[in-house]
Structure formats: structure tokens, C-alpha cells
Amino acid sequence: GRHGMQPTLALAYESSGGNDWVGMGWKLGLGAVERQTRFGVDYTAQDYTLGVNGIAGDLVQAPSPAPSTEYRLNIEGPFVRVQRLTAGDGQQYFVATDKSGTTYSFGQTAASRVVDPADAARIFKWGLDRVEDRDGNYLTVSYTKDQNQIYLNEVAYAGNGSTTPTNVVTFHLEARPDTQALYVPNFKVVTAKRLKSIDVQANSSRVRAYQVTYASSQTTGRSLLESIQQFGSDAVFNGSYAITSGTALPPVSLGYEA
């Protein structure tokens, strides 16, 4: 993207990572602010964690005379400040600013929040939804919401000012056999989908695509990420977003103990 304004999308494995939208143990996301769960969730407390670009830490209130809505990260990192602001719909969201003046917005749009369906103010998670540098180059992130869970839907980048982004990464989902439920205070977050394929386009033309395949754990029945295969610009998707043809690279197989 322009001046490096492109999404940092990396697949990471954590043995304690749980059963996420890319199967057991694997993580794929752009970042989020979440409520601190270490001592149980209190929607009136200002206890938050921030994770983005491989950096993760707790948000601590900035020392006075900073306002009570300003935070710092409790670890050394690129962010000079994090602010809790009010979005257009009246709900809270966060903006982190790094040393170069680039801003990261979390949960500015309702679709990027994991929230109690009975109370829009009880937000559990704020997904990254916009990054913008000092020169006005930006990317936007949209989400698909299903059973209170949010999934990456589209990352659009290489936008500037009033120029809309030219590059779009689209994430296609499929139903999973091993639905996961997370109980947070007052509501339930159900992960009933998993990543199926990814479509990368520039100026409305396909650049490449990826197909994701899973196995089921013989012991637990959970989704195990088996392989990811890259296809060229000639990739063809069927109606359910499986790639049916195209120039394929050898699949990257991900064997691990399950």
C-alpha cells in the first residue's frame, strides 16, 4: 500500500490459543481492545487490554493532568497515548496514536464491537476498524457479525483523503461443525463460523486468493487448520466461496499435535 499503509495480517500459533475462527490454536486478526477478564468482567470498570501488530498489554490510566479518558500501555511499545472517545452512535470507542502520528481506531462502528444485544453500552470487545497516518493514507476494516461474534469481512487499503481505497482483501466464512460458546457477563458469544477462503483484489481485479482447509481432531472433534493454498489471479470461486480452479502453488501444510 501507499507508504506502507497496508494490513499486517499474520497467522500466529499459540498452544493456549483456544479454538478461534481459523481452528484450534491459531490466531488471525488485526487487533482489538478488550475488557480485562483476569478478575471477571465489570462493565463499569475501566480495565482494558490492547493488542495490535503483535503488541499486547494492559491499558492504564494516564497520570494527571491527563483526562480520565486517556490511557497508556503498560509495556514499552509504539503507542504514545490511547484515548477513550464517544462514537457517533453515543457508544465508547478507542483511538491509539503511535510515535509517528498514525492513529488506530477500535470499535468506532457498531459492527466492529462484541456487545450485549440487550444493551449497546455493554461492550466486551472493540475490533480495529481504521488506521490512518499523518499524510491521510488510511485503511478500513469491516466485520461480519454472527451470534454476537465478529469476524473479519473486508480490509480496504491504499485510500487517501477523499480517494477510496483501491486494494481490498475479502474473507469468506463457512459453518463449522465444532461451534464454540464463550460466556461473558450478561450474554453469550458463539463462534459458529470459520475462515474458508480469502480474495485479494487491486483496482477491482483479483491479484491472488487463498483456500483454507481443516481436519477434525480425532480426540476432540475440533477444527484443526490443515493447509493454506495460494492461487493466482485466475482463481475461480464457486457460489459458496470455495476455489474451484486457478494456478495453484503447493499448499502449505500445518501439521501439529492436537
Features from the language model and the residues they span:
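Conserved catalytic cores of ATP-dependent inositol ring kinases
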Residues: G1-A258
